[in-house]
Every structure is written in structure tokens, then in C-alpha cells.
Amino acid sequence: MLKPKIVGIDLDNTIINYNDAFKYTAIKLNLLSKEWVKSNLLSANGISPKNLIKKHILSQNGGQYNWESLQGQVYGNFIHHAQIFSGVANFLLHCYSRGIKVFVISHKTKFGHYDKYKTSLREAAMNFLEQNNLLSGAYGLSKNSIFFFDTREYKVRKIAELGCNYFIDDLPEVFLEPNFPKKTEKITFNPQGQFSYENSFNTWHEINKYFFDNIKLTDVSAYVKGGLNEEVKTVKKIMGRANSNVFKIEMQTGKKYAGKLYPDSTFDQRKRLK
């Protein structure tokens, strides 16, 4: 198991999955038809919906303007159609329960291109993280641990300044920046499988396994506290089978539960406590 002290993570397309937001917003702004989305995105092998939409829009008249306008709307007014990538919350919980500090370091401008309403993209992102409970305190993140920068160069400087042992990003270009710190391990989030770099992972499930090869009682406690929004008094392992572990869980209120934990389900969207 790795023993990092500080982990940095990119935000857009690493923590936040914008694929559905791009589809919805492109249709809403009449840049794509529902028929085009249905016929093209279902057969897109190895290409994300975002990149397929980008390629199509850029091939049209006024493509650059339309694409940049679309980005601004997706990251601002329509960000509520995005999701948190499956497995991100688990990773944050695992870090928090082990005392590993996590920072989110993002290359994100204040405003989107051609947005006459001047919607703050940074405020929109913060609000989105709050609405998805990532800033609730249960995951070790707060507004003070999230940083935005206008350029990739300043983003890389912050990674070095914070002393990140690892940095997770979907863009290999970040790791190619001349001032990217040599002591920071590069982890590429690669959901479409288009890269073949060392330490490249298609899912957050795989990233979790890379960092954490075992589940601790403190992890189980964090799962229950986050799911029930109650303080946990004790967690004890009471038995195990080939594919699961069972725990006796007592809350501070005196309520007691039996929790069954499946190895794979600790990294997917199903409820962990049964």
C-alpha cells in the first residue's frame, strides 16, 4: 500500500464528469439535435461524449466560437447536469480516514468565453461540490483546500508549493509542464483508455485499489457516518466470507447495525451498509 501524505487532484473531467452536461447543453443551445446525439454517441468507441461533441462542433461553420461558448455554459449555468465520477467519494473517504491531506487544484478561468451574464465558473464549481456534499466535512475537503488558477503554469506552481506526493489529472499536458515538480508522482485518470502512460487508470475504482489495498475499520466508520449522518461509537469485525466482511456497528445514540461490506461494492455506487 502507498503511504502518501498529500494528494492533489484536478477538478474538471477528473472529479466532475461533464459528459451528460455537454450532451444536454449542446441540445439546449441548438448546437446538436437529439437525433445526432442518439446516433453518434452510442457508437463512440474510445471517445468521450465531450470530445466527440467537440470534434463535431469544430467541424461546422463558427465552430470555435460555438465550442468555446458551449464550454462556458456547461461549466457555469448548466453544471448541475454534471455528476461526480463514481469512486471519487470513496477515495476521499479513504484519504480522510488515514489522515492524508487532499487538495483540489484546477486550471479554471473566472468566466466562460462569450458569456454575457458573466457567470462565475469558480463559484459554480464550488456550489456544485457543496450540493454533492463533498464539502460537508465528511470527506476532508473544504473551500480552503480548493484552488483555481487562470493558467496551467500557475496550477503546476501550486502543486509544487503544496508539496503534493501525488497528483491525479486527466490531462497528460499538465505533467509535461516544464515546472511540474519532479518529486510528485503522476497519476493519469484515463476513462476512455486513450493513453498508455505508466500509472494510468480508467476508473476511480482502479485508483482506489492502487492507493489502498485494504479496508480499515476507520473506513467502515467513515462510510456509515457519511451515509447515516450520525456519529459512530464502535465498529467490530464479526465474521467474513469469501466475498464479504461483516461488522457490528454501534452508533453514539445506542443504535446498532450489522454492516456487510463487499470488496467491489466499496468502489461503486451501491449502498455499502445492508
Segments from the language model and where they lie:
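C-terminal cap/substrate-recognition subdomain and adjoining C-terminal extension
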Residues: 100, 116-219
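Short, acidic loop-to-helix structural element flanking the phosphoryl-transfer center
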Residues: 72-104, 120-123
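Short loop/turn segments at strand-loop or loop-helix junctions that form parts
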Residues: 11, 70, 104-110, 190-191, ...
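A conserved alpha-helical element in kinase catalytic cores
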Residues: 257-274
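Structural motif
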Residues: 6-7, 166, 257
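Active-site neighborhood of HAD-like aspartate-dependent phosphohydrolases
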Residues: 2-65
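Regulatory N- and C-terminal appendages and interdomain linkers associated
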Residues: 215-230, 235, 266-271
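ATP-binding glycine-rich phosphate-binding loop
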Residues: 226-251
